[in-house]
């Protein structure tokens, strides 16, 4: 509706230019917003105020000229009024609102989608947890966020690839290998003083048991270096397979898994450093190599290669992001834990050093999750240092509830996740409240058929939808494409969970006040069934884009 109104306003301005009532000139960006109070109309624009200086007229005078041109010029507009210093308020015809229902029915599963992305290639890299232990609930929030952002961008017409970056090159892999080897020796009877720096979780014992089952005592007879290398590879592979399975159980499948080690094996770290040196962006000081991140606004330059010749994580990130853009992505999006916020300026510096615009890299920061049970905080880790895993949470509350709860707040704000609330089958549970709205609509259709009323939508009399409840529900449906687009370009899937709760609320309010199946009024019955058909489409589409099911029975 906003886009239609913008087009109408633009046509009106151009008409004023053509007839001389306004002096021809540049048309500003036309802002159309929903007023805070319903009495001020359905929409408002400040375009007259924006044009006043150019036109050398008072804003209200410009508004009066535009209102005269727009009045009666569109089948959208019921009436217009000028408010305050020059705002133009629009009251939309009920018939225009009702036409949204025809659009929804025609679009079906595509309702809400757009082509604003124009096929632009986008990569969303998320989760990317070290293959040194199972995913915890913090990873779960990042997983839900990254997957939902990728789906939103796809729905907005972008060509999206999901990628997992495997951090398999670094000291953590040696630590994993040593942890596995020591647990293996312990299982075979050696007395081991297990270091605190090693991975403490019971999953390391599982890896060791697996090795004993398959290989017996073979690795008691090899050098420590070879034993560490073996358990680093075996442990990493097993853990990564477990991570992949947990993510699949959570409804997430990656298009590509990218190994950090491959950057070294294929010489990409070396060539990236050489490219930056050739550009004068990497210099040597005190035996180390430094990137001139201060050239791009960072607070200090950053080490790429230490004086002992060992590369930093930053070196890998330079090579990795260089590789991403070399693969043809126009827009690269990284989903990180909020504790990495200090890393943002240096990576933006890299992107600019590669000759790209800083905006070609989008970074989503995901804050911590606090677990609750009936409002009481739950211990997030055991004495051995094991965090509550994503698998444990999904097994307890289910995939749908977990995904919805992870997406209920802005990703950069802390999230309270109440396990008992997530399982509750009541209106207090937001995911139940939303899914029940969809199931309830399907139940209404079943009831209609049981009463001999077969829904037929070929010639629905939409003008019969006249009550405030009817029209309020229609208006809420009409904003879904705008919500979807805003969620995509701003990386904010919580906009969809908010919208779903509002739409479910509008539906439940409508149903409590309105009779849907009225045998003595068959045309009104068909109109209201058509309205609910459109609500069901919108609920399902919005849930689907978040990776959540829309059950027909509950």
Swiss-Prot record:
It comes from the Bacteria. Keywords: Aminoacyl-tRNA synthetase, ATP-binding, Cytoplasm, Ligase, Nucleotide-binding, Protein biosynthesis. GO terms for molecular function: arginine-tRNA ligase activity; ATP binding. SMART domains: Arg_tRNA_synt_N (SM01016), DALR_1 (SM00836). GO terms for biological process: arginyl-tRNA aminoacylation. It is found in: Cytoplasm. A motif ('HIGH' region) lies at residues 129-139. GO terms for cellular component: cytoplasm. It is an enzyme of class 6 (ligase). InterPro entries: aa-tRNA-synth_I_CS, Arg-tRNA-ligase, Arg-tRNA-synth_N, Arg-tRNA-synth_N_sf, ArgRS_core, DALR_anticod-bd, Rossmann-like_a/b/a_fold, tRNAsynth_Ia_anticodon-bd. Its EC number is 6.1.1.19. CDD domains: ArgRS_core. PROSITE patterns: AA_TRNA_LIGASE_I. It catalyses: tRNA(Arg) + L-arginine + ATP = L-arginyl-tRNA(Arg) + AMP + diphosphate. PANTHER family: ARGININE--TRNA LIGASE, CYTOPLASMIC, ARGINYL-TRNA SYNTHETASE. Belongs to the class-I aminoacyl-tRNA synthetase family. Monomer. This is Arginine--tRNA ligase. It comes from Citrifermentans bemidjiense (strain ATCC BAA-1014 / DSM 16622 / JCM 12645 / Bem) (Geobacter bemidjiensis). The lineage of its organism: Bacteria, Pseudomonadati, Thermodesulfobacteriota, Desulfuromonadia, Geobacterales.
């Amino acid at each position: 509706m906003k886009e239609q109104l913008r087009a109408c306003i633009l046509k009106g301005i151009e008409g004023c230019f053509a007839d001389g009532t306004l002096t021809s000139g540049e048309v500003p960006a036309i802002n159309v917003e929903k007023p805070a109070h319903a009495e001020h109309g359905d929409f408002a624009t400040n375009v007259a105020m924006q044009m006043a200086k150019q036109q050398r007229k008072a804003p209200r005078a410009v508004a009066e000229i535009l209102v005269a041109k727009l009045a009666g010029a569109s089948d959208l507009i019921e009436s217009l009024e000028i408010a305050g210093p020059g705002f133009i308020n629009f009251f939309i015809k009920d018939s225009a609102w009702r036409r949204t229902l025809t659009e929804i029915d025609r679009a079906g599963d595509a309702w809400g989608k757009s082509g604003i992305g124009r096929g632009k290639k986008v990569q969303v890299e998320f989760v990317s947890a070290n293959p040194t232990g199972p995913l915890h609930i913090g990873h779960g929030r990042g997983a839900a966020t990254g997957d939902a952002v990728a789906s939103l961008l796809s729905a907005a017409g972008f060509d999206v690839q999901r990628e997992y970056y495997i951090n398999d090159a670094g000291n953590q892999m040696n630590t994993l290998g040593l942890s596995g080897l020591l647990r293996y020796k312990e299982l075979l009877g050696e007395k081991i003083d297990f270091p605190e720096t090693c991975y403490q979780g019971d999953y390391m014992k599982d890896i060791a048991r697996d090795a004993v089952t398959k290989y017996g005592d073979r690795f008691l007879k090899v050098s420590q270096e070879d034993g560490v290398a073996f358990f680093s590879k075996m442990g990493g592979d097993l853990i990564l397979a477990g991570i992949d399975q947990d993510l699949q159980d959570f409804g997430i499948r990656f298009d590509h898994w990218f190994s950090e080690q491959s950057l070294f094996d294929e010489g990409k770290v070396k060539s990236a450093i050489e490219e930056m040196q050739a550009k004068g962006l990497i210099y040597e000081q005190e035996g180390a190599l430094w990137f001139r991140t201060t050239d791009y606004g960072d607070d200090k330059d950053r080490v790429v290669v230490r004086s002992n010749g060992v590369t930093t994580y930053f070196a890998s990130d330079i090579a990795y992001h260089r590789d991403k853009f070399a693969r043809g992505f126009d827009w690269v999006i990284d989903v990180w834990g909020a504790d990495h916020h200090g890393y943002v300026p240096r990576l933006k510096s890299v992107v600019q050093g590669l000759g790209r615009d800083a905006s070609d890299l989008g970074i989503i920061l995901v804050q911590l999750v606090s677990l609750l049970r009936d409002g009481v905080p739950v211990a997030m880790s055991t004495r051995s240092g094991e965090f509550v895993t994503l698998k444990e949470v999904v097994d307890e509350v289910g995939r749908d509830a977990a995904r919805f709860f992870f997406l209920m707040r802005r990703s950069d704000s802390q999230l309270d996740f109440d396990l008992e609330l997530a399982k509750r089958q009541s209106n207090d549970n937001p995911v139940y409240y939303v899914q029940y709205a969809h199931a309830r609509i399907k139940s209404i259709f079943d009831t209609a058929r049981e009463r001999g009323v077969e829904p037929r939508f070929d010639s629905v009399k939409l003008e019969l939808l006249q009550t405030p409840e009817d029209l309020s529900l229609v208006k809420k449906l009409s904003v879904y494409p705008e919500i979807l687009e805003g969620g995509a370009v701003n990386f904010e899937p919580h906009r969809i969970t908010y919208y779903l709760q509002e739409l479910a609320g509008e539906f439940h309010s409508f149903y409590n006040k309105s009779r849907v199946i009225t045998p003595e009024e068959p045309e009104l019955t068909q109109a209201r069934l058509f309205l609910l058909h459109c609500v069901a489409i919108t609920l399902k589409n919005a849930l689907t884009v978040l990776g959540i099911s829309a059950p027909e029975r509950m």
